[in-house]
Amino acid sequence: MWLQNLLFLGIVVYSLSAPTRSPITVTRPWKHVEAIKEALNLLDDMPVTLNEEVEVVSNEFSFKKLTCVQTRLKIFEQGLRGNFTKLKGALNMTASYYQTYCPPTPETDCETQVTTYADFIDSLKTFLTDIPFECKKPGQK
């Protein structure tokens, strides 16, 4: 009987001292990736029927040299109309990810221009397709 109690006590002590989670901590929240993919699917599925003019960042976006990321996300979010307002959450989540986990991008020379809504949506698709899912560390190529 005492052997059973000793074995039970050993199991309890061992289970209490065991790690409660994986020793590998996840440092990259990937919710923004799913949000970007969902936004791209919605953009592909919805026809552009508005003839409004909206503002976009006129500087060309390049994944090699990220500039105006927060400005672009803010302007895209503000420019959404109609059914496309469903994308606000995805853009907000992406902005939050980049603001929290990535080095700041230059935001000073972010000139804007007025364009058609169809061109605005095309610019948004291109931006979401080209934006890297993962941050580059300073000095990383």
Swiss-Prot record:
Q: Which PROSITE patterns match?
A: GM_CSF (PS00702)
Q: What is known about what this protein does?
A: Cytokine that stimulates the growth and differentiation of hematopoietic precursor cells from various lineages, including granulocytes, macrophages, eosinophils and erythrocytes.
Name the UniProt key words of this record, in alphabetical order.
Cytokine, Disulfide bond, Glycoprotein, Growth factor, Secreted, Signal
Glycosylated residues are: 22, 27, 83, 92
Assembly, in brief, is:
Monomer. The signaling GM-CSF receptor complex is a dodecamer of two head-to-head hexamers of two alpha, two beta, and two ligand subunits.
Task: Cite the effect that the entry attributes to residue 77 to P.
Answer: 50-fold reduction in bioactivity
Name the source's superkingdom: Eukaryota
Tell me what effect the entry lists for residue 124 to P.
Answer: 5500-fold reduction in bioactivity
Q: List localization entries.
A: Secreted
What mutagenesis or variant effect is reported for residue 73 to P? Answer: 25-fold reduction in bioactivity
Output this protein's name: Granulocyte-macrophage colony-stimulating factor
| GO biological process terms held by the UniProt record | cell population proliferation; cell surface receptor signaling pathway via JAK-STAT; cellular response to granulocyte macrophage colony-stimulating factor stimulus; embryonic placenta development; granulocyte-macrophage colony-stimulating factor signaling pathway; immune response; macrophage differentiation; monocyte differentiation
Which SUPFAM superfamilies does the UniProt record give? Answer: 4-helical cytokines (SSF47266)
Extract the Gene3D superfamilies matched here.
Answer: 1.20.1250.10
User: What does the similarity note say?
Assistant: Belongs to the GM-CSF family.
Q: What is its main location?
A: secreted
Q: Give the SMART domains listed for this entry.
A: CSF2
Organism of provenance: Mus musculus
